[in-house]
Amino acid sequence: MAWQLTVPELQDQLQCPICLEVFKEPLMLQCGHSYCKNCLDSLSEHLDSELRCPVCRQSVDCSSSPPNVSLARVIDALRLPGDTEPTVCVHHRNPLSLFCEKDQEFICGLCGLLGSHQHHRVTPVSTVYSRMKEELAGRLSELKEQHRDVEEHIGKLVNNRTRIINESDVFSWVIRREFQELHHLVDEEKARCLEGVESHTRGLVASLDMQLEQAQGTQERLAQAERVLEQFGNESHHEFIRFHSITSRGEVQQARPLEGVFSPISFKPALHQADIKLTVWKRLFRKVLPAPESLKLDPATAHPLLELSKGNTVVHCGLLAQRRASQPERFDYSTCVLASKGFSWGRHYWEVVVGSKSDWRLGVIKGTASRKGKLSKSPEHGVWLIGLKEGRLYEAFGCPRLPLPVAGHPHRIGVYLHYEQGELTFFDADRPDDLRALYTFQADFQGKLYPILDTCWHERGSNSLPMVLPPPSAPGHLTRAQV
């Protein structure tokens, strides 16, 4: 025999129409409907007139309602072990089987029909329980999700904290190492300065010792001559006169010091006290620059008049154009050539030998800058240059161009690029230990930058001297980490 009802539907059929709970001590009325014994007793107590069945409205007699034994057995068979009995209404002694949604209170069936809750919205406790169970499950799911989010957030915070500590430890180590190297360099410069002072002092003292030795010899001869003269003064008249012209005159002449022998010496060191810090700073600055880059020129970018040699490290402007393929990266008007290596981050230093050229330009250019037609020499077009014009005017190519007060004629130009700080500085690099800044561009660099050399026109041979990328000098540099 197949069952037509599910367990929830069966529970609905076993509910008392008054308390809406599973029957407890069910009684069967004459009409055939069943009710809880307590529900019928409470209902009959509150009604003065005859009792009518709440379901079919048929007049019934509660006193002759027998227990519905079969229904009670079915309920007992379906009841789970350990099911707790509902609490009882203090007013009607009926089970608190309903829940008043307005007052948020548990009530019995009579409270909903006859009491203060009769016009309120009431719901069976089981329904409220199921609803709240679902709400609790939803809330629990939200809390678990929030808990997972918080755990994930805590994990990220812990990882972030660990990363910060690790990065701090690494950076602290770098600082200690850098300062250790700086202290070493300062100690070297200190020893160098002291050695210079001591060497200068030794020379001065040696000169004074020689003069002192000469003066002491003269002093001894004078004392000897003085003793001879005193001895002659005790001789007889004849003896004194006889030996006077022979002996004493020669002794006195020999002992007489030459005029102007003593020449005072002043302590004048090559390094003045007020210049110590500046001089040492210049020497240290040269050493803390990045190691010079080893650069080569890119033939694919060279103007047809340019001739490259010595492993693409030397370029000069010739009189005849070279046969070169027309490529997008090649300059077709300006006599320029790029280095094959570009920079998009970090600190870099390189040098260019310009010699005695009367006209030249050098600097950096964006890889995306146009190379066709006349080169637009300005930072607005991605070109940062300085140069020499007609052998007398140094200038920085900005907007507008800026004349540079350069002392002398540098034969070697140093270029220092700090990409992240947006700095491009040019130096007079003729004296390795005394770099002199010529000009600094400030810019927000974007994309890859390439060193650029512009030999300018050969001027019928008068400006045909080459520009050279010298090999980097190995010693004397402190290579600093990029941090």
Curated annotation (Swiss-Prot):
Pfam families: PRY (PF13765), SPRY (PF00622), zf-B_box (PF00643), zf-RING_UBOX (PF13445). It is an enzyme of class 2 (transferase). One of its GO terms (cellular component) is aggresome. SMART domains: BBOX, PRY, RING, SPRY. Residues 127-169, 203-236 form a coiled coil. Its EC number is 2.3.2.27. This is E3 ubiquitin-protein ligase TRIM50. E3 ubiquitin-protein ligase that ubiquitinates Beclin-1/BECN1 in a 'Lys-63'-dependent manner enhancing its binding to ULK1. In turn, promotes starvation-induced autophagy activation. Also interacts with p62/SQSTM1 protein and thereby induces the formation and the autophagy clearance of aggresome-associated polyubiquitinated proteins through HDAC6 interaction. Also promotes NLRP3 inflammasome activation by directly inducing NLRP3 oligomerization independent of its E3 ligase function. Residues 275-474 form the B30.2/SPRY domain. Can form dimers and trimers. Interacts with several E2 ubiquitin-conjugating enzymes, including UBE2L6, UBE2E1, UBE2E3. No interaction with UBE2H. Interacts with BECN1. Interacts with SQSTM1. Interacts with NLRP3. It comes from the Eukaryota. One of its GO terms (biological process) is regulation of establishment of protein localization. Transmembrane segments: none annotated. Belongs to the TRIM/RBCC family. The gene is Trim50. A zinc finger (RING-type) spans 16-57. The modification N6-acetyllysine is found at K372. Zn(2+) binds at C89, H92, C111, H117. GO terms for molecular function: identical protein binding; ubiquitin protein ligase activity; zinc ion binding. Auto-ubiquitinated.
